[in-house]
Amino acid sequence: MIPIADENPKGFIPFINYLLIATNLAVFVFLMPESVKELENFYTTFGLIPQRLTSNPLNLHAYITIFTSMFLHGGLGHLLGNMLYLWIFGDNIEYLIGHRRYLIFYFTVGIAAAILQMAVRPDSAIPMVGASGAISGVLGAYLLKFPKNRVSILFFIIIIIRIIRVPAIIVLSIWFIFQLFSGYYSLVPGMEGGVAYFAHIGGFAAGFILIKIFERFPGYKH
């Protein structure tokens, strides 16, 4: 089940959303010529490593990586999957709360996502990279504010592929339930994997809650 389109506001240009997508793509392209060893060093330097922050809370660089890690991705599939979700769902939230507040909202839910993942895995020395946590916050906000919007999805039935339109509440609820189950199983020793599911959960919950705060500011579109 892959979302490919939704109902968008007419006559609105979500340039902050475009800027976020363009920045993520540019960083990925910039790093493409690097060797595997150089990439490992770069990700270790600019990825978010929970152990680095929890072992030394006064380490300023560790706090900076909360932001830099949001623009790094582990591969082309990781990048394109994240950007697809941001492209589809981000513009509605930017329209709802305005350009500047959307940028603040995006980074705020990204921080919340990182905090929950670090709380669950405080001793992890594996760099966390990706915009998934922040985008999960966008999804949480979308679920609350646009539950009845129709989302076009690619639906796979064995070898048959169909495009169907279903309410956002169904698409995003299924997505969140999957994150919950995956997060639970990642707590089982030996099942940790390489996905920060609790960042997804934390970001989604933060977005669901914080959008109610952001809508109180002037400029909110009802």
Residue locations for each model-derived region?
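A detector for small-residue-rich transmembrane helices and their helix-helix packing motifs
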Residues: 1-222
